[in-house]
Amino acid sequence: MPIRRHHRWLHPIDWRELSASIRFRRAGGRCETCGRPHGRMVLHLGDGRWWDEEAGRWRDGAGRLVRRLRPPHSMLERTRTTRVVLATAHRDHDPTNNDASNLAALCQRCHILHDKSEHLRRRRLTYLARRALGDLFTGPYG
């Protein structure tokens, strides 16, 4: 995920190198949660299951092999494709904690799922701040 401009000062100067080290050296260019490979087009079903071209099998959202699922060529109407892009995520959502044990290489899907609680928290704070402004000024704040 892109770093917000007002959060850039929280990251170290060598963030690009640190991020690349986590994504490509430690994780080997694969998502550390589901195992999707960086830079490849991946067939998936939208619920976390994806086709692992190398293994010739379906995998679930945790990277485990899935049994009893037909090959993707027989399920074309249900499959979608996505280009996988790895990003480095902070496990504790604290951008100042750049210890290697706190960083994870995640694909878009896993990153969004990992950040879900943090996004909901920020959304609630934004809602409350806007509602507080509504108490000060007239307007459609309902």
Regions found by a protein language model. Give the residues of each.
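Short, charged low-complexity linear segments at domain edges
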Residues: 1-18, 74-89
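Short, flexible, mixed-charge glycine/proline-rich loop motifs
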Residues: 16-27, 96-99
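Glycine-centered helix-boundary capping/hinge motifs
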Residues: 27-28, 35
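The −1 position to Zn-ligating cysteines in a subset of zinc-ribbon hairpins
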Residues: 29-30, 106
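Histidine-centered nuclease catalytic patch
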Residues: 35-105
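Short Cys/His-centered divalent metal-binding micro-motifs
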Residues: 35-42, 103-126
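Alpha-helix boundary/capping detector
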Residues: 48-49, 57-60, 114, 129-136, ...
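A detector for short metal-coordination/catalytic motifs
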Residues: 101-102, 119-142
